[in-house]
Design a protein with these regions (language model features):
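Short strand-connecting beta-turns/loops that link adjacent beta-strands
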Residues: 63, 109-110, 197-199
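Short amphipathic alpha-helical signal-transduction/dimerization elements
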Residues: 23, 148-152, 223-234
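Amphipathic alpha-helical effector-binding/dimerization core
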Residues: 67-68, 73-156
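A structural signal for short hydrophobic beta-strand segments in well-ordered beta-sheet cores
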Residues: 58-59, 104-105, 194
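Short, structured helix-loop boundary elements
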Residues: 9-12, 69, 84, 88, ...
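Extended hydrophobic
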Residues: 160-232
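N-terminal helix-turn-helix
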Residues: 1-81, 231
Length: 235
């Protein structure tokens, strides 16, 4: 964060960053841990938290640890309602047909991708839970790499090395991205780019502990679903 920020914009930036830290934490953090992550005094973190609590965006449990509030769900529903209506039926269909968790991810910023919508199969031996809001580097995992396929090289993050460039070139030629053991240990992912009118670069992907079908046939199923989502969303 720049020291030249105006007080109002700096406070807003810190509040947003606080929400991001809470969302990325493996367990609800304490106020002291939030202050440390923000590199601010505990009193500053406390005031930010009070504001978030007043809007239902965060809350403290009986032990004093901080979690995200239900108000965020209401905000998210408003942002993605049209996309939910267009994508969820297709994600459910793919998940149930292939027996794999299906998700839609978008580019969050220059460095990260975030899952917006996910669907789990109704009947399968092993169900992989992958919640909306899950963030990971755009250079790791099938969903992020599929997004890179749709971007020119100059729009890639600076840490894309020659090995990853070669992998992306291969993925672009075959039309899909493949990953194993990159974002979540032991999980496989197949993903394809997805174009959504008026939205950031996106991808549609499946994840599972194995590949129960040929990766090429999985990719073709994802492409068909992606085309229907794009048409429904742009209608």
């Amino acid at each position: 964060m720049s020291d030249t920020s105006t007080p109002g914009s700096q406070t807003l930036s810190r509040g947003i960053r606080l929400l991001e830290i809470i969302a990325a934490s493996d367990r609800p953090p304490t106020i002291a841990e939030l202050a440390g992550a923000l590199e601010v005094h505990r009193s500053v973190a406390y005031r930010l938290l009070l504001t978030l609590e007043s809007h239902g965006l965060a809350f403290r449990d009986p032990s004093g640890r901080v979690a995200l509030g239900a108000g965020l769900a209401a905000l998210a529903a408003g942002v993605s309602r049209d996309l939910q209506q267009a994508a969820l039926p297709e994600l459910n269909a793919v998940a149930n047909e292939l027996g794999m968790t299906c998700l839609l991810a978008v580019q969050l910023d220059h460095e990260e991708a975030v899952t917006l919508i996910s669907a789990s199969p109704r009947q399968t031996v092993a169900v992989v839970s992958y919640r909306p809001g899950h963030r990971h580097p755009i250079t790791r995992g099938g969903p992020g790499k599929a997004i890179l396929l749709s971007l020119p090289a100059e729009a890639w993050p600076d840490d894309v090395d020659e090995q990853l460039r070669a992998e992306i070139d291969l993925s672009r030629r075959r039309g899909y991205a493949l990953s194993h053991d990159e974002v979540v240990p032991s999980l496989w992912s197949v993903a394809v780019p997805l174009t959504l009118p008026g939205q950031p670069p996106a991808s549609i992907a499946v994840i599972h502990v194995s590949l129960p079908h040929e990766e090429e046939s999985i990719a073709e199923r994802l492409k068909a679903a992606g085309e229907r989502i794009s048409r429904a969303y742009g209608a």
